[in-house]
Amino acid sequence: MKPSERRKARRLAVQAIYSWQLSKNNVADVEHEFITEQNIDGVDVAYFRELLAGVASKHEQIDDLLRPHLDRKFEDVSPVEKAIVRLAGYELTFRKDVPYKVAINEAIELAKAFGADDSHKFVNGLLDKLVRR
């Protein structure tokens, strides 16, 4: 598998996680919507599914790991940043085969693509603190 397939899976997953967070829809419905309505050419679909399902099922545990490293309440983190750090938190905690530098760099790129101007700095700082715990 090409690394770009995983990058595309992360990109799609962060959008699906964002949608799931805001809609509160069943994660299976969100997954189905994204698989059927988005362009999934070149996407590692199995990895996309794992990321979405993993974050949905473990988000409370991931949030608890992130909270001590925040400079604000978790509820005050923007939905986009929340989706990104939850995805990265999942990879850092539950996917030991993914090097931490890769998980952090991918999250930074997602923040640059989807977040506000300084989102990538927030994401980088938070995840760096998480891996140093």
UniProtKB/Swiss-Prot annotation:
> Which of UniProt's keywords are assigned here?
RNA-binding, Transcription, Transcription antitermination, Transcription regulation
Task: Name a single GO cellular component.
Answer: cytosol
Q: Name one GO biological process term.
A: transcription antitermination
Pfam families per UniProt = NusB
Molecular function per GO: RNA binding
Q: Which SUPFAM superfamilies match?
A: NusB-like
Enumerate the Gene3D superfamilies for this protein: NusB-like
Q: Which residues form a coiled coil?
A: none
Query: In terms of domain of life, where is this protein from?
Result: Bacteria
Entry-linked InterPro entries:
NusB-like_sf, NusB_fam, NusB_RsmB_TIM44
Summarizing the function annotation, the protein's role is:
Involved in transcription antitermination. Required for transcription of ribosomal RNA (rRNA) genes. Binds specifically to the boxA antiterminator sequence of the ribosomal RNA (rrn) operons.
Q: Which NCBIfam families match?
A: nusB
Family named by the database record: Belongs to the NusB family.
Protein name (record): Transcription antitermination protein NusB
Q: Which gene encodes it?
A: nusB
